[in-house]
Design a protein with these regions (language model features):
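Conserved GNAT acetyl-CoA-binding A-motif
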Residues: 47, 54-66
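Residues forming the Rossmann-fold NAD(P)(H) cofactor-binding site
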Residues: 44
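Glycine-rich phosphate-binding loop
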Residues: 41
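Terminal substrate-recognition subdomain of acyl/acetyltransferases
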Residues: 93-106
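Acetyl-CoA-dependent GNAT
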Residues: 1-36, 47-49, 53, 89
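Conserved active-site tyrosine of GNAT-family acetyltransferases
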Residues: 76-77, 81
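Conserved beta-strand-loop-alpha-helix junction that forms the acyl-donor binding cleft
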Residues: 38, 63-73, 89-95
């Protein structure tokens, strides 16, 4: 787990699973920013850091984002992720998760 701090306050965090369920590639399990600290570049900084860590393990990075969270999906798309699949009912009945991936090699 990696955290973003402002002073001593945790304002966001991210958690990477080194060998996720998607062909053993690293998987971004969660990235979360306190609502009052969003749109300040903290999420981007945590994502960039997560990608640097993932690149030490593999050349691809995976994540899923829920269909009810289009803002998060757009965030990942702006940062080079593309949807590579859909997984209905992965975490909750009636919710589709979009499987997204990014090639980390430039």
């Amino acid at each position: 787990m990696y955290v973003a701090l402002i002073g001593e306050e945790c304002v966001g965090f991210t958690y990477i699973i080194p060998k996720g369920a998607f062909h053993g590639f690293p998987y971004l399990h969660i990235i979360a920013i306190k609502e009052e600290y969003r749109d300040r570049g903290i999420g981007k900084a945590l994502l960039d850091h997560s990608e640097r860590i993932a690149l030490e393990m593999a050349d691809k990075f995976f994540l899923v984002v829920a269909d009810y969270n289009p803002d998060a999906k757009r965030f990942y798309e702006r940062n080079g992720y593309r949807q590579v699949g859909e997984i209905p009912n992965l975490y909750r009945p009636g919710i589709t998760e979009y499987l997204m991936a990014k090639n980390l090699k430039k």
